[in-house]
């Protein structure tokens, strides 16, 4: 369990108070405010007191403390209510909403921003790029809407002057995928006039203070706020908002959201055009109205991308259609000023609505298919203007306070009235708790035919000139007996009210005196059609799209539009219906004082808000009531896995009996009540424990399902693999048979062919038979060789084998192997080769045979050798099957050196036509010689020497390494050296010479 607050901070939940009374409630609220604890629970309702200072309780660490936690686990916080709404939406796939209410300056807008920040922070753990993009745009939209819809008032430096309801759409995983914003009743009159101590919308000041010099020049603006009539009232006011810095923030946010550069530029042009409109002055020359500063008209025309004469005409004249006739009616100075102001208000309102629509176009959910992506759920966040009581309350305050009456009625219906009625319907023992039901005030305003809005609409539709005083008279006549309505005519002794001007409504939040001045005009919301046509004909496509009705013909008769009050009433009814369809969570904001001080807690001011918000009644209902209720069927569907009596299905008489069994199994029977169709759970702790038990069981269920599914998958994979292996086996057998049949077909009758099938092409074998094919080809080649050998005399076979060995070792590396001649081998005994000494050699050879017991002579030949001392001499070599003898032919073939063949490790020859050969020995005493023949001269015998030696070594199952290089590497008594071969003209015979790296064998050139 997470750490809870100590008692020094008071009660974290008003439900835990010892006695439910206003003094104790206020004492606890004050204590927590003074201790810096601005949030307190009433069950699942959060009471928030505006601290009027920045608190370090909204960072990432705090977010992590509340993420996934239940309400009772952490101290009260906005994050707790946001997480509760998110979990309810995700767990039960149910739409939820967070309703933030309270009077102006109580901190509603900041609360909505922190809630949005929290939801953005806890979603999209997998960091999907598209979800991050949506989250970023949802957050950035806040500062854009604040810039164009918020203003400094006497009660709040960042007061929302419009209502905002945002739906955030989530996919089945709980990640935001889009959203939609509804805006309500922008206070557009603030564009042209503000009360003392207040400012117009932030956007004007941000543009003038944050725009670059170049930008302001292009818009024909200057930084001086007092230069513009529409905003000069608040020019000298100090604000906690840094307009220049906010301008850059808003500009960046618009880019991030997806506004195009030309769209952003159009926004600045519209703001500049409004400021210039306010500086227009009208004079009358006789009966003709004129614009005193005509240059400003040209600037406005340039900014609005239209023609100067068209702007001037729309400001000074009104086009009237009477039947088929069209006339231009001149304005009086007063009418021209009225038209100018109406135009400025309308432009700004259209701009604001266009910004909202543009944001919606970008953030709305696109291409979402519930069959593929699962159910799309919603969390709604309502941030709407709070209850307002000013020194001068007009039509805007009337609408705003009506909105708050509707929201209070929703709270009463859902939290107080419906809850008590449900207990009675379900047969739950209950003691009724009294509360003030403000439905009577809601009806006073919105009732059909009898309410104030209906009376106002009737007055606006009357033929002839209707004044605000006539409207007040109609109110007195029709509502004179209403308990919550009064005026000076109805109560002559009440001197607070002015005759023919004021009326009072007793709102749930207190009495408010309204001045009827401007009610008729603001309700009609009149804007001459000339201005609409002017804007529709703009060459700027953004402006053109803002005024679609401007395309109507002058003579076209249109239906009377709904009045501003009726439009607002309809939007409020739709909003309340929307909120009622969702599971609501409430944040009740309280303003501690009127001085915006973080140190002052005004008891009377706060008590009044606690009373009209019905917070004490909320505590009583909460203490006596139940935190959660659910139908037996749905409850069982969610929690049946907790008990063995209900999992997977129960066999009890009814769902109610099954739920009872489940609750008793968990030991919660003292904390629940059983209604006719629903179970009621008193404390959140029980519900949270049920959720924990369910989460634990879900892990086991998921593991079981995973085990079963893995087994199923394994069996399926085994069957598929077994089938595949069977197919592979039969296919391989088929390929093998096909290959063997094809080989048999192609090589059929090769024995009768002249070349024994040498030209027959082998078929391509399957992969599995590649090694078999190699073996088969080897067998075939041996058979073919045996067939060829049969025709060779037995005496020639050793020579053939030697030639084959030579080819294997030297083919492709030496040009001439001597294959075309007969290989005699023992050339020293041959008279043609050594006619004078052959007779001398034979006795020596016989003596060596007797002495060394050799069986066969492999090779003998005259050579020229070089030793380590660079001495070059003519010698002879005599190779038997046991030894290599170096002999001196000048001394009757005396044996100079004997090398056993087992001591021979390899041969090295060059890659040319020379006869160089190096015999490598184990003791690194290599023998370097160059073969030569006397008859015929320059006969190549290297191939023969290599062939007979390799063939002999092979017969003894030994390997003789043969190297073909140039230069040739050798070792003379352990000293490494090289022998390179050079061809020289006029060289009579091969000869060795010394060089730096070893020796050079010079051979005769052609």
Swiss-Prot record:
Provide the family line. Belongs to the TRAFAC class myosin-kinesin ATPase superfamily. Myosin family.
Phosphoserine is carried by which residues? 200
A cellular component term from Gene Ontology for this protein is: neuron projection
Q: What is this protein called?
A: Unconventional myosin-Id
Q: In which tissues is it expressed?
A: Expressed in many tissues. Highest levels in brain, followed by lung and ovary; expression is lowest in spleen.
Name where it mostly resides: cytoplasm
Q: Which Gene3D superfamilies match?
A: 1.10.10.820, 1.20.5.4820, 1.20.58.530, Kinesin motor domain, Myosin VI head, motor domain, U50 subdomain
Key word Transcription present in the record?
no
Residue limits of the Myosin motor domain?
A: 9-695
- List every position bearing N-acetylalanine: 2
Q: Which UniProt keywords apply?
A: Acetylation, Actin-binding, ATP-binding, Calmodulin-binding, Cell projection, Cytoplasm, Endosome, Motor protein, Myosin, Nucleotide-binding, Phosphoprotein, Protein transport, Repeat, Transport
Start and end of every TH1 domain?
A: 812-1005
What does the entry's free-text domain comment contain? Binds a calmodulin chain via each of the two IQ domains. IQ domain 1 mediates interaction with calmodulin both in the presence and in the absence of Ca(2+). IQ domain 2 mediates interaction with calmodulin in the presence of Ca(2+).
- Is Kinase included in the keywords of this UniProt record? no
**Any one Gene Ontology molecular-function term assigned to this protein's record:** microfilament motor activity
Return the annotated region ranges for Actin-binding.
Answer: 572-594
Subcellular localization, as worded in the UniProt entry: Cytoplasm; Perikaryon; Cell projection, Dendrite; Early endosome
Pfam entry (one): IQ
Residues holding ATP: 102-109
Gene Ontology process terms (BP): actin filament organization; actin filament-based movement; cellular localization; early endosome to recycling endosome transport; endocytosis; protein transport
The record's function comment reads: Unconventional myosin that functions as actin-based motor protein with ATPase activity. Plays a role in endosomal protein trafficking, and especially in the transfer of cargo proteins from early to recycling endosomes. Required for normal planar cell polarity in ciliated tracheal cells, for normal rotational polarity of cilia, and for coordinated, unidirectional ciliary movement in the trachea. Required for normal, polarized cilia organization in brain ependymal epithelial cells.
- Assembly and interactions? Interacts (via the two IQ motifs) with calmodulin. Binds an additional calmodulin chain via a third, C-terminal region. Interacts with F-actin.
- Which parts of the sequence belong to the IQ domain? 699-719, 721-741
Q: InterPro entries, alphabetically?
A: IQ_motif_EF-hand-BS, Kinesin_motor_dom_sf, Myosin_head_motor_dom-like, Myosin_TH1, MYSc_Myo1, P-loop_NTPase
